[in-house]
Amino acid sequence: SRSDGVLVLADAPLRNTPIDIQAEPTPEFVNVVQEEVNGFLDACATQQVLQPTGCPFGFFVTNRIVAPPEWSMAEYPVVNVVPHGADWRIVPADGRAHINVGVRSLFDGSVRNVDEDVEFTIDGTITLLGDGTISIRVGGGEQGLD
């Protein structure tokens, strides 16, 4: 959204006058980012692997799985957007994915069902593009953005 502007009086004509502007995201902007993050995580949950590619969550087993795992989202992280230089960033936020997978013991062949939530953290960067659209890069909070 746009504001009506603020009048700044300078004491010297045609000279740069330093001002400090603190941008804040609109609720609409935060909602768009939240929807995009949720969509990204939903796409992660469709991958039937223990460590979904490019995703902030995964599950490790030392035994064998008997069928591809099934992921779902138990709790989406709540997005908080803050200014970051000329762009924006997503403050680290916690979420929970849910995994359901059968695991066969290499020791005795027994099978147990893993049906549990997996906690994870996301963060990210948001870049405003020249055409007015945004580019959102979601990362895992523990690993950093790079």
Task: Identify the role of each PLM range.
Residues P25-T26, P77:
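Alpha-helix initiation/capping motif
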Residues R2-A23:
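Structured interaction patches on ligand/partner-binding surfaces of diverse proteins
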Residues N38-G39, A43-D146:
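Membrane-lipid interaction segments
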Residues T26-V37:
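Solvent-exposed, acidic/flexible segments
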